[in-house]
């Protein structure tokens, strides 16, 4: 019986019709893709689909992957699927980055303590799916191992980190006997292939952050936006060089493509407190509450699911056509764009390997005119906030509606509709669903300060707030 490790890196990315490199690449030019890393495309025959999730451990899959350097060590959990029958020999590496997510000048031994063998995903960290219509292998790994008496994984420094998962080129094929726990090895001729990379942050609480979300007082932003105000109280930490060494990041709903960074304080109080309370650059569009649905039970369709059936041996889920939410704000409960994998059809069994996949059809009634040149996408945490061919909608002229069919794993999902130009230079998240100052959003604040003694950007403060 395989032992499954728990960790809180909840990863879900879109299920691909063809394989592609999965890595974090964001639109903010200040946050460049990590340097000195070469990616090679993954052949279609090797990997056909993904489910990726990342967050703190202890089952808190909805939280941002942020953990403290000292104190309560939550650890991390990495969980993802590869849609195939065979178990692969996978490894990971962890890279320390600066405030701009560029590789820092530190060597590995300076920022992490770990044994070489702990960088592997062995057979115990992989589980083939249980009698699902779409076969897959679920990979789950904890850092450190949950319940371990001796920590096998220790962060030595705070700051930004990137975790890369790569293929060693070894496949473990299951024997014909389904009850057999033995595996045979087949070595595949291939270079190291980086499958994806994800961001996380290790924090220190060296300063106190007091923050709030307010309605902007500027007329042009009052009805559709939200503003962050903040104080950084040093409590003895030397912030005297804040003008060049301090770096502040505001993030909306756990998205690294929705950030405001580089904000400077408006003034400094007598005790050294940095005050950020009148900055027009700290304004986010409020957006709207997310659309949501669940199909955790494949035998019962619950609104807004209209129909659940099977086609060519696979489950199909038809969602009720979405209304245009742009007209007025309506308060609804959501997960701020996130998702949860849930399987009510197999109680008591590990959901990571029991939940099935289904082709989910989205429909958006929309009267398109000659001026509509932008493409429309189904967008959310389920596909890592990416605009890809897999979540791009097609327009049905006869029915006057946008349509998309996306392969998803059983669970509860949030999503929205986004418009984008072909070159992605224009991205509009509010034209279809609207934007309102009342919308409930979650904001996270990261405060970095350059450490000259060790030559790296420390994360000296972290705060999560909601409006």
How would you describe each model-predicted region?
Residues 133-168:
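Ligand-binding face of N-terminal immunoglobulin V-set domains in extracellular IgSF glycoproteins
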Residues 33, 38-98, 220-234, 347-363:
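Contiguous beta-strand segments within globular domains
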Residues 1-22:
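Bacterial Sec-dependent N-terminal signal peptides
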Residues 115-143, 257-263, 268, 359-410, ...:
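Aromatic-rich carbohydrate-binding modules that target alpha-glucans
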Residues 22-34, 190-223, 436-460:
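Low-complexity, Pro/Ser/Thr- and charge-rich linker/hinge segments at domain boundaries
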Residues 237-330:
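Long, internal scaffold/assembly segments composed of regular secondary structure
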Residues 318-372, 455-467:
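Basic K/R-rich, polyanion-interacting modules in nucleoproteins and related proteins
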Residues 99-101, 167-178, 193, 300, ...:
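Short acidic/polar inter-strand loop motif in beta-rich domains
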């Amino acid at each position: 019986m395989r032992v499954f490790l728990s960790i809180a890196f909840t990863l879900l990315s879109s299920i691909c019709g063809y394989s592609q490199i999965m890595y974090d690449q964001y639109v903010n030019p200040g946050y460049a893709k990590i340097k000195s890393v070469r990616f090679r495309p993954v052949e279609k025959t090797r990997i056909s689909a993904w489910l990726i999730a990342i967050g703190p451990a202890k089952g808190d899959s909805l939280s941002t992957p942020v953990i403290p350097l000292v104190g309560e060590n939550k650890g991390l959990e990495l969980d993802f699927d590869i849609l195939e029958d065979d178990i692969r020999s996978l490894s990971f590496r962890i890279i320390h980055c600066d405030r701009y997510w560029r590789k820092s000048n530190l060597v590995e031994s300076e920022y992490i303590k770990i044994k070489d063998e702990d960088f592997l995903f062995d057979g115990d960290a992989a589980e083939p799916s249980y009698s699902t219509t779409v076969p897959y292998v679920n990979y789950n790994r904890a850092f450190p191992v949950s319940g371990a008496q001796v920590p096998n994984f220790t962060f030595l420094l705070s700051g930004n980190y990137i975790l890369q998962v790569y293929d060693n080129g070894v496949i473990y094929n299951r024997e014909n006997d389904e009850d057999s726990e033995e595996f045979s090895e087949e070595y595949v001729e291939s270079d190291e292939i980086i499958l994806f990379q994800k961001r996380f942050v290790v924090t220190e609480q060296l300063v106190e952050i007091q923050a709030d979300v307010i309605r902007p007082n500027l007329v042009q932003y009052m009805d559709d936006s939200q503003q962050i105000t903040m104080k950084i109280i040093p409590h003895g930490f030397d912030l005297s060089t804040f003008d060049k060494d301090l770096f502040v990041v505001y993030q909306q709903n756990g998205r690294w493509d929705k950030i405001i960074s580089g904000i400077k304080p408006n003034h400094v109080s007598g005790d050294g407190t940095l005050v950020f309370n009148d900055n027009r650059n700290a304004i986010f569009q409020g957006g709207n509450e997310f659309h949501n649905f669940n199909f955790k039970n494949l035998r019962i369709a619950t609104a807004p699911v209209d129909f659940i059936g099977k086609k060519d041996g696979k489950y199909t889920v038809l969602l009720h056509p979405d209304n245009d939410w742009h007209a007025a704000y309506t308060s609804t409960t959501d997960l701020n764009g996130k998702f949860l994998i849930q399987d009510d059809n197999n109680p008591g069994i590990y959901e990571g390997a029991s939940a099935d996949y289904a082709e989910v059809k989205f429909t958006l009634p929309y009267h398109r005119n000659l001026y509509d040149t932008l493409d429309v996408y189904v967008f959310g945490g389920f596909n890592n906030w990416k605009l890809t061919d897999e979540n791009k909608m097609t327009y049905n002229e006869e029915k006057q509606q946008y349509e998309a069919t996306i392969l998803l794993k059983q669970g509860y999902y949030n999503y929205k509709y986004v418009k984008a130009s072909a070159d992605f230079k224009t991205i509009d998240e509010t034209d279809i669903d609207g934007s309102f100052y009342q919308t409930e959003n979650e904001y996270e604040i990261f405060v970095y300060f350059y450490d000259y003694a060790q030559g790296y950007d420390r994360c000296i403060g972290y705060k999560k707030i909601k409006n």
